[in-house]
Amino acid sequence: MIIAQYTRARLVQYGFYARIEGIEFDPRNGVRFCFRMRQEQIRDWGRENLSGRQYGDLKAALRVADVAIQACVANGKVDVSKSVFPARGCVDIKANDAVAKVATQVREQLGLLLPLLEADCHRLYEAGQNVHGTREIALGDVRVTLTEEPCGDFDFGWSPQPGDTLDDLLGGGRYLNLRIRVFRAGRLIAEKVRKGVVDTGNSPHYGGIGRALLREAITINAA
């Protein structure tokens, strides 16, 4: 489980990953922060090399680290000085703290929701239907939505039918964007979009692919 996966991906995109190794979160082993520069050096580098929005993302990543560290300190799990970003090496925090409990709870709820969402979508396929809009499923305070967003057609004069093979569909069809969102207590904590999927009317886009997308999209800032 990566506590700052979203922000970390942004940092990779901005070429900053060479200087920050990462901020990782594992419910079983606690939190691991790996930096190659001190926090002040990181901010200085960002101020000089990033745009305003990128610099904002960088500061957000550091705030995530600060919040997680403070959560561990508050629970008496680790004694961390103010200089928690060493010039070399990393800070390891082994803790089963409140942050870990929240992430574990969300993970367990998603583990129950994903098969239900897949079964719900396959019931539609068996009836010869598509999602057509948004499907939603919830457990406790975790809610998952899956949205079908048509984004273009290529016409072959007839509509795909359940049971069509790939050869049947080579003449045309409809393109979809599939958008999966995960909410916790009403707050968006994960989102993934796959663009340009070919809609065959009965292929498991919302099941197997959707489940894989959702697992990939679990970006939980549990702090």
Walk through the language-model features, giving the residues of each:
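Acidic interaction surfaces
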Residues: 1-223
